[in-house]
Structures are given as C-alpha cells and as structure tokens.
C-alpha cells in the first residue's frame, strides 16, 4: 500500500475519504485494517490476525505462541502479490508493525465520525479596527491584516496580497511537504525492515559458526577446551559489537520515523482548519518544521557484507604441539572449510600469542 500522496487532497472531501477507505481495506477479511497492522517484506499490509490465519493455514504443523514445542518458523504467500514471506520461530509476531498505517486509520475514523464542513465559516476581525474583517495578508510582516491597516494603519508601507492567494499558496506548500515526509517515512520503514533482517542474518551466521567450532573442538583433548573458550568469547564479542551497532541504527531510524509521523499527523490536522486566518497564524511554523524534518540526514547503514561472520571459520588439524596456536584466520572468506584456520608456529614458533585475540583487524 502506498500513502506517498501525503493526504494532498483534504480528508474533508467525501470523494477523497471514499478513495482513502479503499486503500485501508485488508485483502484477507475485506474489512478496514484492525490493529495491530503488520507490514510484509514486499511492503503490503495485513491485519496481524489475518496474517496469522493465512500463516496457520499454510503451516498446519506449526505450533502457536504459548506452546511448549519450539518451532523453526514457516512461510506463506502475500495475498496481494504472491511474494513468499519467510517467518522465523516467532511467526507473524516477528513481523514489523506499520505504525504509519495505524495512525492513518485513527485519523480516518476521527474524520468519518463527524459531519463534513461542520464548522460554520467565521471571520476574524481586526484588533485595531474592530468593524473590519481581516481580508488581506501583509507580505512584509507575514501576518493577516485588514484593508484599513494597509490604507493608513501599521501596514501602510508594506506589500500586501489577497488573503485567499496566500492561503492557497501556503496550504499547497505544506501539502507538498507532507507528501515528501510520508514518502520518506515509507523509505525509512523499508530500511528498518532491511536492518532487522541484517540482525537476524548476523544471529544465524553466528549460531552456525558456533556449531562448527563446537563440533571440531569435541575431538580434541582438555587443552583445547581452554582455547575453545577464548575463540568463542572473541566471536561473541564481535557479534555483540555488530548487533549493538545495527540495533542503535534501528533505534535512530525508529525515533526519526516516530517524530516524522507525529509531525505529519499535526500538519494534517492543521490543514483541516477552515479559517484561513487561523490557519495562516500557525502554517509558517509547521512549514518550517516540515522542511527541517525533510532535510534530516540519518546515519548510514552498515556496509555490504557487514553481517558476515565468516572470519570466525576454523578447521582443526591433529597436531598436538601446535594446539595452543590455533587462531582465526585473518580475512578468511569461509568458502571452503578446509581453509578456515591457520596454525601459527609452523616455522618453529609454538608460543601462545594471545594478544592477537584482543584486536586483530580481521575481527573488527
């Protein structure tokens, strides 16, 4: 579902409300999305309950939450585009919630509950000339005013314009800004989803490498147990460093998304103000906030291959005198398990060089 139009048409228009409602229909239950709303990797949305129904139907042997049996996940196809969705052991509860869509649904329901154009149009009166309506806009001072103020009042030397002209201009400017923010929110949501997948890949790769280490160290004697602990600690340290970095980025992107969504909601509510003068009193500040939010630069994502843990691949050779020199091979690609480890000391050096575990470039 794509909401990048940013509510450019006002929600107060009945035709546009009908069009928006069509975009908020779940393809499974054919009703308006019910919270929580989850977003699939293909960027389509479903009620979490509906997603769970489809998932359970596609995976009849999968154990639901609360079961004592540990499940390995499952898969199902998106009902909108048929893209295959692969889930982890958490099932549909591991899918990201689409808070933006949930906020839009709340706003839509609020708008639908009240009659259109319920507020009678009123005119603000000039504070200096109580019998004069505010009907022009001072471009120099950037405030609404009345005709008498222009003729012989405080704004007689200022440049002015008709109130409706400035009203339409600034409303269009704010609407365009909202569209940019909503489009940016979609991109941020996609980035968050991708980085969560990176976290999962890091954990999967780390788990695989730990299993390989354990399998190979089981064949060695007690002296290997000490070294195995050292290597596992190094792997876990780098894993934690990587996960902390990616999770920190996820929190940063999430905070930006939340702030941007709140600003979008505030701007949309401001656009619903039917009084031009009241609207213009707060429009400039909102426009500035929207512009500033649109220019916020987020921290870069992890570089390609950041999730790889292949540098921790090892292979065990039965050379007892070199056991204590086993170390992770710097820059190991992990393509062939037979090349996963090097034995320091082949030239006669059998000393334990533990300082290489503290900070080799291949581990960072």
Curated annotation (Swiss-Prot):
Region span, Disordered: 328-364
Major location category of this protein: cytoplasm
Positions annotated to bind Zn(2+): 126, 129, 149, 155
Compositional bias segments (type: Basic and acidic residues): 353-364
Biological process according to GO: cell differentiation; innate immune response; negative regulation of microtubule depolymerization
InterPro entries reported in the protein's UniProt record: COS_domain, TRIM/RBCC, Trim54_Bbox2_Zfn, TRIM54_RING-HC, Znf-RING_euk, Znf_B-box, Znf_RING, Znf_RING/FYVE/PHD
COS domain sequence ranges: 271-329
Positions of region (Mediates microtubule-binding and homooligomerization): 168-211
Protein name: Tripartite motif-containing protein 54
């Amino acid at each position: 579902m794509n909401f990048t139009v940013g509510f450019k048409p006002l929600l107060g228009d009945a035709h546009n409300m009908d069009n928006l409602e069509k975009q908020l229909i779940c393809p499974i239950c054919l009703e308006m999305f019910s919270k929580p709303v989850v977003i699939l990797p293909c960027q389509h949305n479903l009620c979490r309950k509906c997603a769970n129904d489809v998932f359970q139907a596609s995976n009849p042997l999968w154990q639901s939450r609360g079961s004592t049996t540990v499940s390995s996940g499952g898969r199902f196809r998106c009902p909108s585009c048929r893209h295959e969705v692969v889930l982890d052991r958490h099932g549909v509860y591991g899918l990201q919630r689409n808070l933006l869509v949930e906020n839009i649904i709340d706003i839509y329901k609020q708008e639908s509950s009240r009659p259109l154009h319920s507020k009678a149009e009123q005119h603000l009166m000039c504070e200096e000339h109580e019998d004069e309506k505010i009907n022009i806009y001072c471009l120099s001072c950037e405030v609404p005013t009345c005709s008498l103020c222009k003729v012989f009042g405080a704004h007689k030397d200022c440049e002015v314009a008709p109130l409706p002209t400035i009203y339409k201009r600034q409303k269009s400017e704010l609407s365009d800004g909202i569209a940019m923010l909503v489009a940016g929110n979609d991109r941020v949501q996609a980035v968050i989803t991708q980085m969560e997948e990176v976290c999962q890949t890091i954990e999967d790769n780390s788990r695989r490498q730990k299993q390989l280490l354990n399998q190979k160290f089981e064949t060695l004697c007690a002296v290997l147990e000490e070294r195995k602990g050292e290597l596992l600690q190094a792997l876990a340290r780098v894993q934690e460093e990587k996960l902390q970095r990616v999770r920190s980025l996820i929190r940063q992107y999430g905070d930006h998304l939340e702030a941007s969504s709140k600003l979008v909601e505030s701007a949309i509510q401001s656009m619903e103000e039917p009084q031009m003068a009241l609207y213009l009193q707060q429009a400039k500040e909102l426009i500035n906030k929207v512009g500033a939010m649109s220019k916020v630069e987020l921290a870069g994502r992890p570089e390609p291959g950041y999730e790889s843990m292949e540098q921790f691949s090892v292979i065990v050779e039965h050379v007892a005198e070199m056991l204590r020199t086993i170390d992770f091979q710097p820059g190991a690609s992990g393509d062939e398990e037979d090349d996963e480890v090097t034995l320091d000391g082949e030239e006669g050096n059998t000393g334990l060089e533990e300082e290489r575990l503290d900070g080799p470039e291949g581990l960072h």
